[in-house]
């Protein structure tokens, strides 16, 4: 209970909502004695407050508050609640729950103007008959987001709870506002709509749907009410603003809870009120609003006056209502029309047609002289009417008086009488008004449909309340029937479903029958041969009248149905023809005019004029009306069956059934409106009236079940998640605990009453109020946790601040110490000297540093300029990419919203599917009810015949009557026997077709037979009771006549007593036999149900496994689709690669014509080449990731196939076992069926005999008792009636036990529905998981996009470098064209190499395409299989398919982005190759350039240029050093980039593993959810045939998959052989390369020896010794740098050896390089021979050697580049690390030897010339480089060999796995074929059984028709006997009156 401060938020409404604290304190302090204060039954006020004065002798003396003394029985005294419970807000919390306590609580609250009160789960509201300030905006804000217990009772609280339930439970809600007419339903409906429009407003007032909208959606929803009330509300006897139509307003909300749209459905407009009203009533408000003259332009427009009495149609009752201001209401209506967007033309047409209806009532007609035909009496009114309707007045009058009627194929003009014309005018008026109203509703719905995305809706139902008028017609019957159905829905929801929920969840609960079943009255109205059925039947007969309709009602129901009675005649009251006992009271109905109202005929000639009217609205209203003329003109148009005769009652029932279906799909919230008094007096309450409504509405029963039961329930998982915070230690982290056990531990650890909750199978149930307590405890716990968290955070922040303060303190101390020390020494002389000298010491060094810094500054400035330009360019690209990224994000966001909408629509469809399944079950139950009714009617006919025979014959003919009854009994027994056989056969067929899963046989044997027998007994007893009561009345009125027959009765009495004793003895024997048979039958039924459940469990397991197979196959299809997309992407990449290879070849042809390039450009190209290699590594890593994913998927596929094979084996074994058990069960079932049939037959016979004898015994006993009572002055009548009442109560108890059995039988169905709901929740969770997976995919897409952007930048840089290289090539082309001619042969060789590479690439592309084609075929087959397997799911989940389509579209978008990325990577790869080719050609051009320089130097041979040459070479060496320094920097940068890439790669691999684990979890969850759903879907009848087709297709698919696996295995074997051949070739090539390298080393040593001998003769070279030493130092540094570069290249090799596809090509290139090295060795040998033969040509030989060395260097560098490419392809071969270490040591030793020899060569070369020494040193360095490159290539070749060995092992393992899979699939195919054969055999058996049952059914149908003929004959005899009985009764009444 909130305090006064908390209630201040409600403003002035607070006193009207809740008691103040002062009042509560005063109530608690009032004196109260629980023993004496009480309520007592009072004849005046039903109940009165009083005090107990005394109690003695079974009587209690009570003194009331008005000082009256009453003496009553103890059962008439009720306990009173303590004063603190006065005006309690929830009556379920009352200590003593009884009728007076509820009544006085409502009365006390009503006196204080607190009109809303909770009553358990629903709300009760009392009409205040005055305005209260409880609907203001402050009150709306006060209730927004409040829980029910946090705010006082109010309609806003109910609305907010429904709104919150919709958001949290994601379920449609409904608010049912019910009550009698005048109880305030319409007002509360408007308040609900006001609340939703306020709290869920869209928030954008400026946004309009289109140009038609004059207001926001909230304004339009609110404005719809005034317009509908104006045209659909009217004053009645009990209500000034009564809704004369029903409406169901659906308010739709979007995903965020904002208003999305709304729509309105209307039901049964009371159109008869347009032309007729009672005296105390009036017509619809719109007529009087128009006549109020608030808008004079309407008076002129409609040609009317302001006096309502000028218009008979609207002035038959009252014309003014005190509580309604028609003038203001007209303004509100007109404003609503504008807000709702009606066009001016539509608005004008609306008013015109309303005015035309008023004018219709003034049209007068008279009879022609000497004729019966009518003619117009004046045309003025007709002219006005025709003007408003856009017609010709003469045509209108002619059509009314002389309509055209179709006779045969011709039309004739028929004359009408005056009465006929008036009836036609009335019908047309009502039709125009009704169609106008329906069009208006449709137009409002169009305006409220905003096309915004919807998610859920809240429906508000406002139906006309229960009506009891003086004159009640067909409209009142429809309204009251609707309220009867709604009350039945309420009872079922509150009492039946609630208790069935307890049973289903396994909670200990005793079923309570509250006696609220309204089925009798509902069946009387709507069932076959009910009131509506007879009404429609009479409407089909042309000569039927209201009297014939009344007679049929009497014949069918009078005396047979307790709810149908003949009304009592009351003087001064309108004549009534029959009475119905409704839940709210007895209503007298008059059938006058019912046939005409139901048929609703119209003058078709006038309707034809309407269709051609110039008033567009009128023509539109009747555009679809099918007249006879239209039918004649459109003979070929197909007409819907029955459309020509759609009665009002049939349309009403159709709409009502639709409404009930809508309500069943929602979560209802009930609001019960109460009328306090009949006089509309504010504050007054009539106890009897309110008590009657409370009893009828089930308020007390609802409170009881709320108190006794467990109204609050939560799923275990939700409870664990929400309330775990109460005691987290009870549920430890990191440990799996079942949700149910966790909830049990959690609740056990909390200090609450453990009797206040129960644990069900899936939920935990709470008593009323306990959940609120838990919420308060949770809020307190959260407050403590948040407070503690805040304290920890604040402490941490302060500690951080303290540490900063301490650091500042220490810094200050340090600064102070240094300053003090400086101040102490700054005046010291030596320190001054130090200050002066120190700057001078650094001046020289500073100048050098300044010079260096200036140079660096200039370089930095240039680089800054370049970087600035590049930065601007990148910024522009960044802006573009950011824009693209934003667009993509918007697109992804839109797609995600659409995805969520599609998921919600999918959920709604699934729910709709479940609802349809529930409807199917209901239809089945209805069919069973129909069969029961048929049996009931047959039994009733038989009893009527017995009755008639008894009345017809004298008591002396009792034996003849018994014989006749026996004969009819045997005939009926035969009929029941046939029907029983038919039902048993049908049940067996249904059970087999649904895999014997439904326990219909049990329901048929145990429930239907027993229920039918017991209901027959109960009906016979009730019939007996009514008959005896009637006989009592007759005997009382004819007592004197009975005295005359006393002598005869005495004689018959003695005879009957003898018969009675015999009958009693036979009855006892029969009852004993019946009990024994019942026990045996129940035992057999129990055994059968156990066997049936066991079979169903086994079959369910089989279906689950089969569905799991289907789901795995669907998953395989998805994986194959992904593989196919990957393969397609690769094929595209390969194609682009081939294109780039051709372009590269063209560029190579052009570049080979060019000359050399400088060493600076070479270094730049090396740098670019390194960048290209990095980008290519990234590309290859991405490719490897894709390949790893494919390999993982394949492995998963193989594992899944293995599991499937094992499961299929298990299934086969289980199936065989089940089939064996099934055959055994079938035999047992047949035996049991035969025994049950025999038992049921004997049971039925015995029961028939028993009932007959009971009837005879009861009649004899009644006659005997009546005789005795007449002799003893009726003193024994009371005791006899009490005895009969006891007997009936015993029978009612038996009926209750039967009902409890029925509830248990229904429990299975409700449990299935609950399981489906649970599965739906699990599927929602799975979809949420998929949404998370989608987000991760989007994240991957973003990463790929970023990678794409980086690659775009790299591409741009490559293009710039390429353009620069092309410009340089163009410069050198003109200079070295002559050299290009000499290199034609080399060009041809390069072309051959490129051609060979192209051919290999094409072969690989063809192989990939072949695989893609194979996978495409496999995909198509799998798709076909999946489409067939999932046909049932797709039928129910069409929107889910749309969702999947959207997902695939999104995947395509991702694939496109991946494709773009791969294209860019392919472009980079091509550019990389192009750059390598350019680098190679640049090396060649450089060599040519150096050769030309050497030749120039040789021709001149001038010694004077030697020193200049040395200087030039020195400068070149310095430049090379700088270049080496730059390369060192670039190497370090590349190492950093390499480390970053490695980290990114590791993160990507971790993310991939995480995603794979997530996918596995999702797959498992999906498999579980889908298996559960499929298990339920598999219960449908059509599943057997579908499974047969599916298994056949599965066999075909498996066969295709087997073929595909065989082909893939062959392909793997072929690849294995090819790889083995390649490996052998690689080994041979490597051995050749090793030998050639050894030979090269040997040749090199011999050349060096020769150089030593030669250099001994070069004495003049001693002058350059110092220079050579310097050069030697430079060479050493260069060697160290080259060694570091070797290490860098080795690291690069280890990072980039992953691309497998180009291995074969690179091996071929290696072979070619070996051949080139062989050629180089040959040239070296030739050089050696030249040196030995001719020392005089030493100079030329040295130059030749230098040229050859340069060529070798070029080839070596090319070999290094190619080796790097090959190493990128062979990364996975890391098993050779030990071998690499050994090779590394050998190489280091070789380098040392070469270095030592180089030193010796330099010492010997001192004697030679400078030029020769310099060239020889150059040659030595080049040979060293060549040797190192060759060693690297050898090492890399060994790596490649290891890699291919491991690859061969992997392929071998994969081939073995494929072989195993093939064997498993073959076994699977064999087993499935066997299964298909068995299913075919079962199908044939089912067909045979169906034919047998069809024959039995036809036979039973024939016998049924014969029985119906006999029943008709008996019915005619009954009618005759009734007539005789009436005559006999009337004669006895006359005699009685004469005696009196």
UniProtKB/Swiss-Prot annotation:
Q: Which residues carry this modification: N6,N6,N6-trimethyllysine?
A: 130
- Is Nucleotide-binding found in the keyword set? yes
Could you list this entry's UniProt keywords, alphabetically sorted.
Actin-binding, ATP-binding, Calmodulin-binding, Coiled coil, Cytoplasm, Methylation, Motor protein, Muscle protein, Myosin, Nucleotide-binding, Thick filament
| Top-rank taxon, per record | Eukaryota
Segment Disordered: which positions? 1260-1289
Residue stretches in coiled coil = 840-1933
- Name the residue ranges with Polar residues bias: 1269-1282
A single GO CC term for this protein reads: contractile muscle fiber
CDD domains assigned to the protein according to its UniProt record, in alphabetical order: MYSc_Myh3 (cd14913)
Question: GO molecular function, one example?
Answer: microfilament motor activity
Localization: Cytoplasm, Myofibril
Any Pfam family: Myosin_tail_1
Domain spans labelled Myosin motor: 86-779
Task: Please report the stretch or stretches of sequence annotated as the Myosin N-terminal SH3-like domain.
Answer: 33-82
Family statement: Belongs to the TRAFAC class myosin-kinesin ATPase superfamily. Myosin family.
Q: Which PANTHER family match?
A: MYOSIN HEAVY CHAIN, NON-MUSCLE (PTHR45615), MYOSIN-3 (PTHR45615:SF6)
Comment, domains: The rodlike tail sequence is highly repetitive, showing cycles of a 28-residue repeat pattern composed of 4 heptapeptides, characteristic for alpha-helical coiled coils.
Sum up the protein's function in the record's words: Muscle contraction.
| Assembly, per entry | Muscle myosin is a hexameric protein that consists of 2 heavy chain subunits (MHC), 2 alkali light chain subunits (MLC) and 2 regulatory light chain subunits (MLC-2).
Name-wise, this protein is Myosin-3
Native source organism of the sequence: Rattus norvegicus (Rat)
């Amino acid at each position: 209970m909130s305090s006064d401060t908390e209630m201040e938020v409600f403003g002035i409404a607070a006193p009207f909502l809740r008691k103040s604290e002062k009042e509560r304190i005063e109530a608690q302090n009032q004196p109260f004695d629980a023993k004496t204060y009480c309520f007592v039954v009072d004849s005046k006020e039903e109940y009165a407050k009083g005090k107990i004065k005394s109690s003695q002798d079974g009587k209690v003396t009570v003194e009331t508050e008005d000082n009256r003394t009453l003496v009553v029985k103890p059962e008439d005294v009720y306990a009173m609640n303590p004063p603190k419970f006065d005006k309690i807000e929830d009556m379920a919390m009352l200590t003593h729950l009884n009728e007076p306590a509820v009544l006085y609580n409502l009365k006390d609250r009503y006196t204080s103007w607190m009109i809303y009160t909770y009553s358990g789960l629903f709300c009760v509201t009392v009409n205040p008959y005055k305005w209260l300030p409880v609907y203001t905006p402050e009150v709306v804000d006060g209730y927004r987001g409040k829980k029910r217990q946090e705010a006082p009772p109010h309609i806003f609280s109910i609305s907010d709870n429904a709104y919150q339930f919709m958001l949290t439970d994601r379920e449609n809600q409904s608010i049912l506002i019910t009550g009698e007419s005048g109880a305030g339903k319409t007002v509360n409906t408007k308040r609900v709509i006001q609340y939703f429009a306020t709290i869920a407003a869209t928030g954008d007032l400026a946004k309009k749907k289109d140009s038609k909208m004059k207001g926001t959606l909230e304004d339009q929803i609110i404005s719809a009410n005034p317009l509908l009330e104006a045209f659909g509300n009217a004053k009645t006897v009990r209500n000034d603003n009564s809704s004369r139509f029903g409406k169901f307003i659906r308010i739709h909300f979007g995903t965020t809870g904002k208003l999305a749209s709304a729509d309105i459905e209307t039901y049964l407009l009371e159109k008869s009120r347009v032309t007729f009203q009672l005296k105390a009533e009036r017509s619809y408000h719109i007529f009087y609003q128009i006549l109020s003259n608030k808008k004079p332009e309407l008076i002129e427009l409609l040609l009317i006056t302001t006096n309502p009495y000028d218009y008979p149609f609207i002035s038959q009752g009252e014309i003014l209502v005190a509580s309604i201001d028609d003038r203001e209401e007209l303004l509100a209506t007109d404003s609503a029309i504008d807000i709702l967007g009606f066009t001016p033309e539509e608005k004008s047409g609306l008013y015109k047609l309303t005015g035309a209806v008023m004018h219709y009532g003034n049209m007068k007609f008279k009879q022609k002289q000497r004729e019966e035909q009518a003619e117009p009496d004046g045309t003025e009114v007709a002219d006005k009417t025709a003007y408003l309707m856009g017609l010709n007045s003469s045509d209108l009058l002619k059509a009314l008086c002389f309509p055209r009627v179709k006779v045969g194929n011709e039309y004739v003009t028929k004359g009408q009488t005056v009465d006929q014309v008036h009836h036609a005018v009335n019908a047309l008026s009502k039709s125009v008004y009704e169609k106008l109203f329906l069009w208006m509703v449709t137009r409002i719905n169009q305006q409220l449909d905003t096309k915004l995305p919807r998610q859920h809706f809240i429906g508000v139902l406002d139906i006309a309340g229960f009506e009891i008028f003086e004159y009640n017609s067909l409209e009142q019957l429809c309204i009251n029937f609707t309220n009867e159905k709604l009350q039945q829905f309420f009872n079922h929801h509150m009492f039946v479903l609630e208790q069935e929920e307890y049973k289903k969840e396994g909670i200990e609960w005793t079923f309570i029958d509250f006696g609220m079943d309204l089925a009798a009255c509902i069946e009387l109205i709507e069932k076959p041969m009910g009131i509506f059925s007879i009404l429609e039947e009479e409407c089909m007969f042309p000569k039927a009248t209201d009297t014939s309709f009344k007679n049929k009602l009497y014949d069918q129901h009078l005396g047979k149905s307790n709810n149908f009675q003949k009304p009592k005649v009351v003087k001064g009251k309108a004549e009534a023809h029959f009475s119905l006992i409704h839940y709210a009271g007895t209503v007298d109905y008059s059938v006058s005019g019912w046939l005409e109202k139901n048929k609703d005929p119209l003058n078709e000639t006038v309707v034809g004029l309407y269709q051609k009217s110039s008033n567009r609205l009128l023509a539109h209203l009747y555009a679809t009306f099918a007249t006879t003329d239209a039918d004649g003109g459109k003979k070929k148009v197909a007409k819907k069956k029955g459309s020509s005769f759609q009665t009002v009652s049939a349309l009403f029932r159709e709409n009502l059934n639709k409404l009930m279906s809508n309500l069943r799909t929602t979560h209802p919230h009930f609001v019960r409106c109460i009328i306090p008094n009949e006089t509309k007096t504010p504050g007054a309450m009539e106890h009897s009236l309110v008590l009657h409504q409370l009893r009828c509405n089930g308020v007390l029963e609802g409170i009881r079940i709320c108190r006794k039961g467990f109204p609050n329930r939560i799923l275990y998982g939700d409870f664990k998640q929400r309330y775990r915070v109460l005691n987290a230690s009870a549920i430890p982290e990191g440990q799996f605990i079942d949700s149910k056990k966790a909830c049990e531990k959690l609740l056990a650890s909390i200090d609450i009453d453990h009797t206040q909750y129960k644990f069900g199978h899936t939920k935990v149930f709470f008593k009323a109020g306990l959940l609120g307590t838990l919420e308060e405890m949770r809020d307190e716990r959260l407050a403590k946790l948040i407070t503690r968290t805040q304290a920890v955070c604040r402490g941490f922040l302060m500690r951080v601040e303290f540490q900063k303060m301490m650091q500042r303190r220490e810094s200050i101390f340090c600064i102070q110490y240094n300053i003090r020390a400086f101040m102490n020494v700054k005046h010291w002389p030596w320190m001054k000297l130090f200050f002066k000298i120190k700057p001078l010491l650094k001046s020289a060094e500073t100048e050098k540093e300044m010079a260096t810094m200036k140079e660096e500054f200039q370089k930095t400035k240039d680089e800054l300029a370049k970087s600035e330009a590049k930065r601007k360019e990148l910024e522009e690209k960044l802006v573009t990419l950011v824009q693209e990224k934003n667009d993509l994000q918007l697109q992804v966001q839109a797609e995600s919203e659409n995805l969520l909408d599609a998921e919600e629509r999918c959920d709604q469809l699934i729910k709709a599917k479940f609802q349809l399944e529930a409807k199917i079950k209901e239809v089945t139950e209805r069919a069973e009810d129909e069969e029961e009714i048929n049996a009931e009617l047959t039994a009733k006919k038989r009893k009527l015949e017995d009755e008639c025979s008894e009345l017809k014959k004298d008591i002396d003919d009792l034996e003849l009557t018994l014989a006749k009854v026996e004969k009819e009994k045997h005939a009926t027994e035969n009929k029941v026997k046939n029907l029983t056989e038919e039902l048993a056969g049908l049940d067996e067929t249904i059970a087999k077709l649904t895999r014997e899963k439904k326990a219909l046989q049990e329901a048929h044997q145990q429930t239907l037979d027993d229920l039918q027998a017991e209901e027959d007994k109960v009906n016979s007893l009730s019939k007996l009771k009514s008959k005896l009561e009637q006989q009592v009345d007759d005997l009382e009125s004819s007592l004197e006549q009975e005295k005359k027959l006393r002598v005869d009765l005495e004689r018959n009495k003695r005879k009957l007593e003898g018969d009675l004793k015999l009958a009693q003895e036979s009855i006892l024997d029969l009852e004993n036999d019946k009990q024994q048979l019942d026990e045996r039958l129940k035992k057999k039924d129990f055994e059968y149900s156990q066997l049936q459940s066991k079979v169903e469990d086994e079959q369910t397991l089989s279906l689950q496994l089969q569905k799991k197979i289907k789901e795995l196959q669907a998953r395989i299809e998805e994986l194959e689709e992904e593989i196919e997309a990957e393969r397609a992407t690769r094929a595209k990449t390969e194609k682009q690669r081939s294109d780039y290879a051709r372009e590269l070849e063209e560029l190579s042809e052009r570049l080979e014509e060019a000359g050399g390039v400088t060493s600076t450009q070479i270094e730049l190209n090396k740098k670019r080449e390194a960048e290209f290699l990095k980008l290519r590594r990234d590309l290859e890593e991405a490719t490897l990731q894709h390949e790893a994913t494919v390999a993982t998927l394949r492995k998963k596929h193989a594992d899944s196939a293995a599991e499937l094979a094992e499961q299929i084996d298990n299934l086969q074994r289980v199936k065989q076992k089940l089939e064996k058990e099934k055959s055994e069960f079938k035999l047992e079932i047949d035996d049991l069926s035969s025994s049950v049939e025999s038992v049921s037959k004997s049971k039925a016979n015995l029961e028939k005999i028993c009932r007959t004898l009971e009837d005879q015994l009861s009649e004899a006993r009644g006659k005997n008792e009546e005789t005795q009572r007449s002799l003893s002055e009726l003193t024994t009548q009371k005791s006899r009636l009490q005895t009969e009442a006891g007997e009936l109560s015993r029978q009612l108890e038996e009926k209750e036990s039967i009902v409890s059995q029925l509830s248990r039988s229904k429990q299975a169905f409700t449990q299935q529905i609950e399981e489906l709901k649970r599965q739906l929740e699990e599927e929602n969770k799975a979809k949420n998981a998929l949404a998370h997976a989608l987000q991760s995919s989007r994240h991957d897409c973003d990463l790929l996009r970023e990678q794409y952007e980086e690659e775009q930048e790299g591409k741009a840089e490559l293009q710039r470098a390429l353009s620069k290289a092309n410009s340089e090539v163009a410069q050198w082309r003109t200079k070295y064209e002559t050299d290009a001619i000499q290199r034609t042969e080399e060009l041809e060789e390069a072309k051959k190499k490129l051609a060979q590479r192209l051919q290999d690439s094409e072969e690989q592309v063809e192989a990939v395409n072949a695989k893609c084609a194979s996978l495409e075929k496999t995909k198509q087959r799998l798709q076909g299989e999946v489409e067939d397997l999932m046909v049932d799911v797709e039928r129910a989940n069409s929107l889910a398919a749309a969702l999947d389509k959207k997902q695939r579209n999104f995947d395509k978008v991702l694939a496109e982005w991946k494709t773009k990325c791969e294209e860019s990577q392919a472009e980079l790869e091509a550019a990389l190759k192009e750059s390598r080719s350019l680098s190679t050609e640049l090396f060649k051009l450089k060599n040519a350039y150096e050769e030309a320089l050497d030749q120039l130097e040789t021709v001149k041979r001038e010694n004077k240029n030697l020193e200049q040459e040395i200087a030039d070479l020195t400068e070149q060496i310095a430049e090379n050093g700088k270049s080496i320094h730059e390369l060192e920097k670039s190497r370090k940068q590349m190492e950093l980039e390499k480390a970053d890439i490695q980290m990114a790669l590791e993160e990507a691999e971790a993310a991939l593993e995480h995603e794979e684990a997530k996918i596995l979890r999702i797959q498992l969850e999906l498999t579980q959810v889908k298996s559960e759903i499929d298990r339920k879907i598999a219960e449908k009848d059509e599943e057997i045939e579908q499974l047969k087709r599916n298994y056949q297709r599965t066999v075909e698919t498996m066969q295709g998959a087997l073929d595909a696996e065989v082909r893939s295995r062959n392909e793997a074997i072929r690849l294995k052989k090819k790889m083995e051949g390649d490996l052998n070739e690689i080994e041979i090539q490597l051995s050749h390369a090793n030998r050639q390298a050894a030979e090269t080393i040997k040749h090199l040593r011999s050349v060096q020896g020769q150089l030593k001998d030669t250099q001994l003769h070069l004495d003049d070279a001693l002058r350059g010794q110092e220079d050579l030493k310097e050069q030697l130092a430079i060479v050493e540094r260069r060697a160290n740098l080259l060694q570091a570069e070797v290490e860098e290249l080795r690291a690069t090799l280890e990072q980039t050896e992953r691309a497998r596809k180009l291995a074969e090509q690179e091996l071929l290139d290696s072979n070619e390089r070996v051949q080139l090295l062989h050629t180089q060795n040959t040239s070296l040998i030739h050089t050696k021979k030249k040196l030995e033969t001719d020392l005089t040509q030493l100079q030329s030989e040295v130059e030749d050697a230098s040229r050859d060395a340069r060529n070798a260097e070029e080839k070596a560098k090319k070999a290094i580049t190619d080796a790097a490419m090959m190493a990128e392809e062979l990364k996975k071969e890391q098993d050779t690390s030990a071998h690499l270490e050994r090779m590394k040591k050998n190489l280091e030793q070789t380098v040392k030897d070469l270095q030592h020899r180089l030193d010796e060569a330099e010492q010997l070369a001192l004697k030679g010339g400078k030029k020769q020494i310099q060239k020889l040193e150059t040659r030595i360095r080049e040979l060293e480089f060549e040797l190192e490159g060759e060693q690297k290539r050898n090492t890399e070749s060994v790596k490649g060999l290891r890699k291919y060995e491991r690859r061969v092992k992997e392929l071998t393992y994969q081939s073995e796995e494929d072989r195993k899979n093939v064997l498993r699939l073959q076994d699977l195919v064999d087993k499935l074929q066997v299964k298909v054969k068995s299913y075919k055999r079962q199908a044939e058996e089912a067909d045979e059984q169906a034919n047998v049952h069809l024959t039995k059914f036809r036979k039973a149908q024939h016998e049924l028709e014969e029985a119906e003929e006999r029943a008709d004959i008996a019915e005619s005899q009954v009618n005759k006997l009734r007539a005789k009985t009436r005559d006999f009764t009337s004669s006895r009444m006359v005699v009685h009156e004469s005696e009196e």
